[in-house]
Regions:
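Bacterial N-terminal signal peptides that target proteins for export
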Residues: 3-27
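Bacterial N-terminal signal peptides
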Residues: 26-34
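Active-site nucleophile-adjacent alpha helix/oxyanion-hole segment immediately C-terminal to the catalytic cysteine
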Residues: 45-184, 237-245, 282
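Non-catalytic membrane-recruitment/adaptor modules and adjacent regulatory linkers
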Residues: 157-205, 219-224, 244-250, 282-289, ...
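Active-site signature of cysteine proteases
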Residues: 205-314
Length: 314
């Protein structure tokens, strides 16, 4: 009997181990399905995303958030990491600040947070810790002037206390250059408001392509409006399978009489979320400066304000 009991014990152990293995495989499968579902849900804006806010928050909560270093002498760790948490909990909260030329970087930030929030947080943490870091194979080694300025910007609204966003906007402006920056390449105090931080259309296209790793196509220019007969129909079609950003003159919108404006230049980048039309009234819903906005204008005014239509592959 003793001899016969040993095989049954071995058989029980075998089946027990086999069951545990199967349960682990089932659990792992459910975990993969859960994460895949999270990414599908999070990817409503982009068809393919790299990471989710949940993954980014888990990483953020796992790191030391009290460390200081000499690379960024004016960055306060509590304000820096609180700002990163805000970016993850409210991805549309990025605020370029009053009177700055950061609006293009704000639009780019919205897109980055839709596609790779974990990459953003890891990049910012490494940049803070080491003074340099790479995002999507783009190496950032900020100048000393920029590193000293981050955390000191004042009278910019809530940007004053958002030290991560100050750092992010400044290093983007320091890294990417266009013809508007040719004579303002080196940062000096107050340059967040000058041509040093300005972004022309080609520079914006290049930033989006490099940071998101996706194809970008634009129509229009910095001075001449796009050769599009019916902007409304064009935008509706583009929104069907692309992410769309607009390069506009938003000062026109605030004029009482649009017909009196004879000359204008583009001043602002927005992320278009939807566009509808009832008779001659066109309603745009878009993101800019930390929130969604709705604007109702005529077809004539729509054509007048748009200088660039940027189509980004999902």
């Amino acid at each position: 009997m003793e001899f016969e009991s040993k095989p049954s014990g071995l058989i029980f152990a075998y089946y027990s181990n086999s069951l545990r293995t199967q349960l682990k495989l089932i659990s792992f499968t459910f975990l993969l399905l859960f994460l895949a579902n999270q990414k599908i849900f999070a990817g409503e804006f982009f068809g393919e995303i790299i990471s989710t806010n949940e993954e980014a928050l888990a990483f953020l909560n796992s790191i030391d958030q009290k460390k200081e270093n000499s690379f960024w002498p004016n960055i306060k760790p509590d304000l820096f990491y609180d700002n990163l948490k805000l970016n993850l909990e409210k991805p549309g909260s990025f605020y370029p600040g009053r009177s700055t030329n950061f609006c293009a970087y704000g639009a780019l930030s919205y897109l980055v947070m839709q596609k790779d929030p974990l990459g953003y947080v890891k990049f910012m943490n490494e940049l803070y810790e080491k003074g340099s870091a790479s995002f999507n194979n783009n190496l950032f080694k900020p100048s000393k002037g920029v590193m000293k300025a981050a955390g000191t910007l004042k009278f910019k609204g809530v940007l004053d206390i958002r030290h991560a966003e100050q750092m992010w906007f400044l290093v983007l402006a320091d890294k990417f250059k266009g013809y508007l920056n040719l004579f303002h390449k080196k940062f000096k105090e107050g340059d967040e408001n000058t041509f040093w931080a300005a972004t022309n259309l080609a520079k914006f296209d290049r930033m989006v392509s490099k940071m998101l790793g996706t194809h970008v196509k634009a129509v229009g220019s910095d001075l001449i409006k796009p050769w599009v007969k019916d902007p409304y129909s064009y935008l509706v079609k583009r929104l069907g399978n692309k992410v769309v950003s607009l390069y506009i003159n938003n000062q026109i919108i605030h004029k009482k009489n649009h017909d009196k404006i004879k000359f204008s230049i583009p001043t602002h980048y927005i992320i278009l979320k939807s566009i509808t039309r009832v008779d001659d009234k066109i309603t745009l819903r878009y993101w800019d400066y930390g929130s969604d906005t709705e604007m109702q204008i005529s077809a004539k005014t729509l054509k007048k304000i748009i200088f660039g239509i940027i189509s980004i592959d999902k």
